[in-house]
Regions:
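Hydrophobic faces of well-ordered beta-strands that scaffold small-molecule active sites
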Residues: 3-7, 39-41, 71-73, 101-105, ...
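Active-site mouth loops of central-metabolism enzymes
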Residues: 7-22, 76-84, 174-183, 290-299
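Short, acidic/polar
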Residues: 18-30, 183-190, 301-308
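Conserved, mostly hydrophobic/aromatic
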Residues: 31, 35, 43, 62, ...
């Protein structure tokens, strides 16, 4: 079982972005001290839902601040950035961190970001497969040319090569950074499976929905010629929420008190690029749903819920939102308890 944190750098009502980012950095430092496996960083623009606009930039800082823990993006949005630029950044972080970086990618949403960064609605609706293909080419080949509808350019040399990681004895370790794909639809599940890429599944999904997506991924990957061994060992990641307290109701109350205000403020701030109608989740009902799905409660309850999800879905990697209280000290305590009290119950 590999348990990590999911860091949104959430800006709660009454807070500034600096407070949210400081909490993100501190929670990562505590995660490493507490023995957790990884930290996953979200990326958002123009909204207080999450105030980190560049997951790879924050990943670079956190990789420099830590020595053991893995740091991943959850996710870097391909619809609003050039896949070659992202590939260069990923290779750089992979090589300079000793292989501790994971690149999570997704297509994002139909937000005004598409207008600001120039991709347009076309990039969101049709461009993800081409962007992913170009990114994977960059991470795996010595020379790359752009031959798609969106990206066309002459062949260039890949520098630095992501597959030239130095080992402790001075040799080279083959392979570039791990790449995972955020999947919210069968179409994206099939795309990830055909590429043999693990999935990152959202915290709004229950175990049955995640199990169904894993089953679709497995059948598609096998049909695409992936080996049974690679399919069995695919490291899918389940996103969730964790709040550890001595009593179940105490943990739930902490989140129900703080999260709805953040959700309401953050979700209402999203603006669609084309004015399409959108229905916002009820913040209180959504918080209560998350409390029922995920490890929210005493250490034993939290461990049992993680173990149950692993048994039902086959997923043994977790990215858990730990800042739901909105408070720095409470977040640090929550992360510490997750690592020192819950994790030992899973080994």
């Amino acid at each position: 079982m590999r348990v990590g944190t999911f860091v949104l750098a959430a800006q709660f009502p009454g807070q500034g972005p600096g407070e949210a980012l400081h909490r993100a950095v501190r929670s990562t430092e505590v995660a490493e001290e507490s023995g957790l496996d990884s930290v996953w960083l979200a990326e958002h623009h123009f909204v207080p839902y999450g105030v980190c606009p560049s997951a790879v930039t924050l990943a670079a800082l956190l990789l420099g601040r830590t020595r053991r823990i893995r740091v991943g993006t959850a996710v870097s949005v391909l619809s609003t950035q050039h896949p070659v630029a992202l590939g260069e950044q990923a290779a750089l972080l992979h090589l300079t961190s000793g292989g501790r970086f994971t690149l999570g990618v997704g297509r994002g949403g139909p937000w005004v970001d598409l207008e600001v960064f120039g991709g347009g609605l076309e990039a969101y609706e049709k461009g993800f497969p081409e962007s992913l293909e170009l990114l994977l080419d960059w991470l795996g080949r010595p020379k790359v040319a752009g031959r798609g509808e969106r990206y066309g350019f002459r062949e260039v040399t890949v520098v630095p090569r992501a597959d030239e990681l130095l080992t402790e004895d001075g040799g080279e370790s083959p392979g570039g950074p791990e790449v995972v794909v955020a999947c919210t639809s069968p179409k994206t599940v099939r795309l990830a499976a055909e590429k043999g890429l693990p999935m990152l599944l959202g915290m709004h999904c229950g175990d049955q929905e995640k199990a169904d997506m894993v089953a679709l991924w497995c059948s598609t990957a096998l049909a695409a010629g992936r080996s049974p061994e690679s399919v069995r060992e695919a490291g899918h990641v389940s996103a969730g929420v964790a709040q550890i307290a001595d009593r179940p109701q105490e943990a739930v109350e902490t989140l129900v008190k703080a999260m709805p205000g953040w959700l309401r403020q953050g979700l209402e701030a999203h603006v669609t690029v084309d004015g399409r109608h959108r229905v916002m989740r009820d913040p209180v009902a959504y918080t209560e749903l998350l409390c029922g799905l995920h490890p929210v409660g005493p250490p034993r309850l939290a461990a049992d819920r993680l173990a149950a999800t692993a048994e039902r879905t086959g997923i043994t990697r977790f990215a858990l939102l730990v800042e739901g209280s909105g408070d720095l000290a409470a977040t640090e305590e929550n992360v510490a308890r997750l690592g020192t009290e819950v994790l030992p119950l899973l080994t």
